[in-house]
């Protein structure tokens, strides 16, 4: 098992998992399943697990619709003490943006605590190749319920979370 603490401080560092899948509708359920599995291992309640599955499914479908050709969808999951951050992106043609209107966008805002989307490039996205090639990305954050806003602002969460069991 890998050590997930930093040597200098002894604090837990975020655990990160990266998936690259074709944007085919037959492959997107694998990403949804990974989101659900990670959320369960992090002790999210069952409603939050299902919310994450649905949010990831909607984000991936949205990105698949704006992706360029046969380029893969990249999804980076980062488990922290406070919750789960999911960054998903797909290469696009220059000038392509993520649609932020309609029912799908409203669903994303309802299911997670934070959602951001927009154009970027390979140099700035997690798991990117460092180039300036354009991508469309969606970032989702779902916090564990045990962390109140005051605890998050104070920076003093009360427990570590690991995705390993």
Q: What residues fall within each predicted segment?
A:
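Conserved beta-strand-loop-beta-strand hairpin that lines the nucleotide-binding pocket
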Residues: 1-18, 62-165
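Helix-loop-beta hinge of the Bergerat
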Residues: 11-44
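Ordered, soluble secondary-structure elements with a strong preference for glycine-centered loop motifs
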Residues: 25, 46, 50, 97-102
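Conserved ATP-binding N-box helix of the HATPase_c
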Residues: 45-70
């Amino acid at each position: 098992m890998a050590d997930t603490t930093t040597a200098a401080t002894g604090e837990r560092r975020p655990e990160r998992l990266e998936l690259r899948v074709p944007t085919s509708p037959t492959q997107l359920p694998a990403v949804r399943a990974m989101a659900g599995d990670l959320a369960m291992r992090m002790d999210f309640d069952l409603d939050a697990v299902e919310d994450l599955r649905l949010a990831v499914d909607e984000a991936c479908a949205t990105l698949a619709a704006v992706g360029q050709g046969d380029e893969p969808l990249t999804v980076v999951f980062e488990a922290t003490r406070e919750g789960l951050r999911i960054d998903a992106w797909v290469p696009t043609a220059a000038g392509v943006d993520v649609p932020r209107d309609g029912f799908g966008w409203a669903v994303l805002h309802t299911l997670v605590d934070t959602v951001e989307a927009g154009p970027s490039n390979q140099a700035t996205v997690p798991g990117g190749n460092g180039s300036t090639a354009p991508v469309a990305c969606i970032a989702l954050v779902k916090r564990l319920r045990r962390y109140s806003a005051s605890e998050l602002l104070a920076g003093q969460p009360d427990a570590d979370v690991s995705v390993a069991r």
